Amino acid sequence: MELNQLRCFVSVADELHFGRAAQKLGLMPASLSRHIRMLEESLGTRLMARTTRSVALTDDGLFLLEGAREILERTEVLQNRFQTSRQERVEILRIGAIDSAAAGLLPTLLHDFRQQCPEISTQLSEDKTIRLIPKLLSGGLDLAFIRAPDFVDPKLKTVFLFHETAVVAMSENHRLAHNTSVTIHDLADEPLIVPERRSRPHSHDLTMKLFIEAGLQARVAQLAEEKQTIVNLVAAEIGLAIVPQWTARLAVSGVRYVTLQTDAKEAMNKLPLSAAWLKGVRDPARDLIVSLLQSRISQYAENA
């Protein structure tokens, strides 16, 4: 017994005429008769008494009609339910990003991705690299933008994107605030606000190594973890801070951002940004955004 056979049976029962029922279903009368005959054979009983002039349901036909209507109605409800669910289901790409990428790269990238793939929604989580990597490994994220550590878990695929330029954040009242640029030597003996190495190793090491390369000792006045906190401390004239260029978008009152000039050999005045995802996981949405990113990487890097 098949659903199509039941639909044919109910249609004939409603019309009590094979020709009209066949027309209603879009079938040839001979094809409709064959479906009814196959249904009767599968049930082992006559469902209709047919003459050249009339069609009537047998007792078994009347019994089946009630159940057939219920089956078809339930089937339609289920089909509609899953069709609606399928239409409403939106693919979600879960993206994690360090604060630098969340404020710098991601707004432009996500805008471009939405233009290209409007049917895919994105969910953005901002965190530090040390917490984003475990989320990738556990399947909690599909893609992350991180500062790749020296040792990367072999289960992860990482792709270097570009370096983010570092600038010096200082109080607008500082003696160097109106300079167009400064060097590390200009910052000698200046109190510095530095991120903790445990949570931000790349940013911490950047400051320290720049001073070491210049033959100077960094004078750390304050350790802080969050970029917003660091910039607020700069505004309070606690010290200066070497931060990614995007930090200027925080627009904290009383803070100026000055270009940091370094010698050619000092390539460490930039912070590396990488994309990472779990190897061996098929994810078309992730692949689409990575492809878009790689195709426009030079454009995105210009503003880094």
From Swiss-Prot:
Keywords: DNA-binding, Plasmid, Transcription, Transcription regulation. GO terms for molecular function: DNA binding; DNA-binding transcription factor activity. Signal peptide: none annotated. The keyword Cell division does not apply. Coiled coil: none annotated. Disulfide bonds: none annotated. Transcriptional regulator of the ttuABCDE tartrate utilization operon. Belongs to the LysR transcriptional regulatory family. This is HTH-type transcriptional regulator TtuA. The gene is ttuA.
